[in-house]
């Protein structure tokens, strides 16, 4: 949100990492009452008009005696859609909508998609060596620091990362954002673990108290469930399709928990399964400039063919990755 008065920007704000307060509230709270009066506030999405974790933004705008509200697109949330426009107009506030709508539609692509189908927008990510290996047997990073940084930025834009217990037991990943300034934007984590076989010393298990973590399971013992709860893990029983956890069920659950997009970082088996069932909306494939050779593990030679078969558009980016390559499928 940007607030302008007498042709000068007097305040701005963005939605907090937790989703609340909204951008409007964060921009308005920086100003004194007299500064807010007769100003114009620019926002991308129609201000909310319902009570949730915080009061409605329209009430805040009205109380601030804002003269004019400019926003890009109506919110698809039925609690707000079109209602805020009417409320603001009825309070004699000038309202202009559809401002730079084309750009806003791109920004809110994931959000609108999730609202329409009640499931998150699904991204996938893999990093492979030049000779198509997923892992180095010596546990060295496959890609360079530039690629790793881009991957962390990608995580910062995601609500929840989906992974498997096999990936955790093998690699013990952190799945957070480890770039200065983005630490607070680490996504939630969802672990797929049908029989609850996750290692008790894993980082994710022992860090759940600091970052919301779900574990989807099917077969269990009370002892295992109690252990998960003691670690602040949220266990969720999932039905099976064949011998696998029902991924549609998992997506719907994650959407109900407020996740509008997810990123799958789950290795060869999960990625192939979801590709075969066309679950991905977009996919990022990082390709290292290095060959691993005899130290390589988990070869995925047909991955580029499988991705090309699933997606219509491909964008190759090497600009900021030194000798590595990033292929974006969408």
Please state what every model-predicted region is.
Residues 19-20, 100-127, 133:
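Proteins enriched for Cys/Gly/acidic motifs involved in redox and nucleic-acid/cofactor modification
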Residues 35, 114, 121-330:
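Enzymes that bind and transform nitrogen-containing heteroaromatic metabolites
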Residues 50-52, 77-81, 103-107, 130-135, ...:
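Short, well-ordered, mixed-charge alpha-helical segments that flank or form enzyme active sites
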Residues 3-103, 188, 275:
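Zn2+-dependent cytidine deaminase-like catalytic core
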Residues 7-13, 103-113, 204-208:
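A short, flexible N-terminal coil/short beta segment enriched in small residues
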Residues 1-15, 123-130, 134:
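Active-site and channel-lining beta-strand-loop segments
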Residues 57, 80, 84-87, 100-107, ...:
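Internal, well-ordered alpha-helical segments in soluble enzyme and binding-protein domains
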